[in-house]
Each structure stands twice: as C-alpha cells, then as structure tokens.
Amino acid sequence: MFASPGPELFQFGPFVLRWYGLLIAAAVLIGLNLSSSLAQQRKLENGLISDLLPLLVLFSVIGARIYYVAFEWHNYAATPLKALAIWEGGIAIHGALIAGTLTLILFCRWRQQSFWDVLDVLVPSVALGQSIGRWGNFFNSEAFGIPTDLPWKLFIPEQNRPIIYVNQEFFHPTFLYESLWNLALFIILILLFRWGSKHLNKLPAGAMSCIYLMGYSLGRVWIEGLRIDSLCIGALPPACEGGLRIAQLMSGVMALAGSLGLWWLYGRKKPLPDPGFRPN
C-alpha cells in the first residue's frame, strides 16, 4: 500500500512548485536531449529538434486541453472561461497526440523534412515522457482505478474519491500500470533504434512510429478499462455503464493504424506515404 504525499513540492510565499509541473518539465528536458541525440545519429538537420520541441509542447498542451473540454463540455457550458483554467486540471493524452501530429506535419513541410524520419526519433522520448508524466497523477491523487485490496493498492484521500466510492479507501494505481507499460515500451523502442542503426534496410522509416502506436494503444485499452474517470460517450463516469470510453476507442484506432502501417512496410514492402516532405 502507498499514498501520495500531496501535489505540492514546496511553497515560498505566493510561489508554489507542484510535482506535476516539475515532472512535465523534467520529461521535456530529457526528451529534448534524447531526441537530439537520436536525430544526430540518424543525421537529421542540426538544431531540428530544439526548434521543433517548443512548438510541439505548446500545441500538444493546447490540443490536450481542447480535447478534454470538448468531451466534458457539460461542465464548462455555464462558465466557458473555466476552459482556460488548465491549472485546475483536465487534459487528455489523445488530444495531445492529435495536435502534436498536426504540428509535426506542418513543421516538416516547412523545414523540408521527412515526417516519418523525424517521428521515429521522437517516439522513444514520447514513451519515456509519458512514463515520467504519469507520476503527476500519483501526486495529484487522480486517474486511479476501481477499488482493490491488492498489496500494491493506492490510498486515495476522501476528497478525491467519486461519491459512489466515498467509503472505499484503496484503488488500483492505474498511473503506475501505465508508467511501467510506457517504460517497457521506451526500452523496446531504444533497443530497436540501436538495432535499426546497424540494419537500416530492416527498419524502414515509420516502423518505429507504428510500433509505438501499437504498443502504447494496446496497453491503454487494458488500463483504461480499470479507470473510473474515463471520458465517455453515452454515459457518465465513474462507471461508463452502457457508454463508450473515448480513450479505448481512440487507442483501438491507433493500434489499427500502427498494424496497417507495419503491414504496408513489411507485407507490401512499400514506404509509408509521407505527409511531410520527402527529399529526392
């Protein structure tokens, strides 16, 4: 059994340093250094990642917020300006992935880079960043699962529990499941990258990205089924009974896209269509 020490690392006057913000900043810095190193190994343009990352982070956060608010509009319709209060919580990773992808496409067209070449050096950092960032959910006592009595159960303070579970104290630490899953995915992607650097003809452009899509999505489908705060269509959390969990739907689409991409690369032995710029 374990429990969060609280969302704040320390406070100095009006300044409050929150664990979540610190973890996100750490993930961005680690991702910048790792992706820059991988880009250098793949001989991409110098400074490409450092130019790209601020745009990716900015628009991914905006996309994550818009996505969340769109599916939770019933909570914002009366006070639309609350949609801007991102510090109060409420972002969704699939919104970040959609916005990040669109940003990357436009960036690659601007800088005349192959979309898949750039994405392949980013996805290990994305997986690692997700693994790190999920610990922010731990400190905030959020994004947890259904009640459980397993040895690794997570204590949730009463004020953070849904009403129907107010008498339950211990829940599945779904943040931990996803953090470990993404860490394992990161290790697999790094090993594949190193192997692919020695066997370029066996790991074509886009293969790493497709493996990330499949790997992350399969884990998310399983973990999302345990969560009690899912965005839903046709029902309301925490149960989502009779409704559809949006994250599971999106993850299913992403897993299908990744598998089709691998089939295209290895089954048809053709390069993936590049939405960015493919040099001659």
From Swiss-Prot:
Identify the keywords attached in UniProt to this record, alphabetized. Answer: Cell inner membrane, Cell membrane, Membrane, Transferase, Transmembrane, Transmembrane helix
Annotated pathway: Protein modification; lipoprotein biosynthesis (diacylglyceryl transfer)
Annotated TM spans: 12-32, 52-72, 86-106, 115-133, 173-193, 203-223, 246-266
Q: Which major enzyme category is it? A: transferase
In which residues is a 1,2-diacyl-sn-glycero-3-phospho-(1'-sn-glycerol) bound? 134
Q: Which domain of life is it from?
A: Bacteria
- This enzyme's EC code(s): 2.5.1.145
> Got a GO cellular component term for this one?
plasma membrane
Task: Please give one Pfam family short name.
Answer: LGT
Q: Name one GO biological process term.
A: lipoprotein biosynthetic process
Q: What would you give as a GO molecular function for this chain, any one?
A: phosphatidylglycerol-prolipoprotein diacylglyceryl transferase activity
Name the membrane topology term: Multi-pass membrane protein
Report whether ATP-binding shows up as a keyword of the record.
no
Keyword Cell membrane (UniProt): yes
Q: Where in the cell is it found?
A: Cell inner membrane
- InterPro entries in the record: Lgt (IPR001640)
Q: Which family does it belong to?
A: Belongs to the Lgt family.
NCBIfam families attached to this UniProt entry: lgt (TIGR00544)
The name this protein goes by in its record: Phosphatidylglycerol--prolipoprotein diacylglyceryl transferase
Gene that encodes the chain: lgt
